[in-house]
């Protein structure tokens, strides 16, 4: 039997990733084990994906049951799990219509295409400007990576889609300066993830809503990372009490099973008439059965309330550790999406702490070169939390 090790990755895989040296082979809850049987506490959740932990019993049961019924039938047909999930999302959010895809990038691609199509249908081709924010991240398709405000990801692929304008995040005056009647949409993350876990201010998001209303533009919330309970609310827009026209969701929606969704209103959805946009696998029964169970669990008020309590404990513990090590300039975030910015002396070295944490049996993330990112399972146990912080303190002890 072939023993697959990290060196084989370099021999057979395209090198657009540089994975860790250890290979996880099994996970349960917030524990992960590698090929050698070493135990890790997972403070990453697969980048805010496995929000119910690894191999959650309820999710495994649903997946097993659906796997014996129907896997795929294409969008020439619909399915019961697809309709059940769409119904749940409509019941629990502002949305009246849902489209399913396979990832966050696809959800954002669909949202941007819908915004442009809606503008063409109602105002003409000249209304095509998209306003986005510097250091944002919306996916890796040519359209979404161009809308994301990071040249390191978007440069080098030839001409980019036109009529995309980037302005500073949390700067309403900058948006006002470029907003006009040719703007079809503003797309924003309620919390910028890849740039360092930067929450939007209440006034900023409320101001975007008002500007969009004034200029007949659509407001798109990219909740790929903040959605499905991550902030302590089912979706972050509920915390801010600012309702978007289009919302995108993915990551935690499938708890590790690939699925994405675009949510919008009935009126806006009319612009996606039959054949205008599509997907082969979007809304497949396996993914939707899993996601419906995820929504059932996470949307329960006691579950969401516990996330907020766990968030308070997590932030408090980070502050206590920082009082001892003094490595963090700022600790910020919402719910269980938390960033700890390193002091200037350690700028550019966040990835070093990630590697050291792994050596100590802890999985953490970066959010840019200066920020450690924490996104544990929303239902992480007290035992796993305590053990994880013990290993984090060891990691940060200089």
UniProtKB/Swiss-Prot annotation:
The gene is argD. Pathway: Amino-acid biosynthesis; L-arginine biosynthesis; N(2)-acetyl-L-ornithine from L-glutamate: step 4/4. This is Acetylornithine aminotransferase. Its main location: cytoplasm. GO terms for molecular function: identical protein binding; N2-acetyl-L-ornithine:2-oxoglutarate 5-aminotransferase activity; pyridoxal phosphate binding. N(2)-acetyl-L-ornithine binds at residues 140, 279. The modification N6-(pyridoxal phosphate)lysine is found at residue 251. It holds the Pfam family Aminotran_3. Keywords: Amino-acid biosynthesis, Aminotransferase, Arginine biosynthesis, Cytoplasm, Pyridoxal phosphate, Transferase. One of its GO terms (biological process) is L-arginine biosynthetic process. The keyword Transferase applies. Signal peptide: none annotated. Its cofactor is pyridoxal 5'-phosphate.
